Amino acid sequence: MIVGESSRHPPTSTRYEFRRAGVFAACRRAGAEVAIFPEGEWTPVRLRGSLFRWVEVARPLLECDRLIYACCLKTHWLSKFSISLKHSVGCVRPRHRARLHFGGHFEERVAELAGAVQPSLIVVDGRQCYVRGGPCYGVVREANVLLAAGDRVAIDVQGIREIQRIPGNALRHDPWQYRQLQHAVRLGLGAANDDQIALVQAGSC
């Protein structure tokens, strides 16, 4: 088992954040390896879409047998929400991530970067979540939910709906109206409508 991460951009240090959060100690106890993506190797990956031709992805993500995402549930001032599709941005080399912010179409660019890797399972920790602001500062509330799926579009749709249950949230549109999800559907990254999603409840957290 390998636990990997890449902080958003300098001066944030992935190694520092891992140490602060106790990840190194937890991995030692579990017998897991740690991968600090910015300190490792990157592999070019071609993308489908019109906004990126290719990006570099952390090599361990392409060589592992199974890739499991561990995501947060939050709003985002630029991409509107940050769940599993936006989580994929952390898989990409920082200098390529910077291109998100040039040329407009930020939400569509997020969806295209998400096509660089294919997780087998996505787990979203929504015990607490941002309901306004984000990704780093904003209004935090308790959502008391854990989500798991193999489909990034499906889990992001449900994640948005969980945020929308909380009074004062910033997400006012039907999930399928957000451009990040619309472009992900065009790229074939997941479910295309509610009829393709089955919600199975497994108790409360």
Residue positions per predicted region:
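N-terminal and secondary-structure boundary signal
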Residues: M1-C205
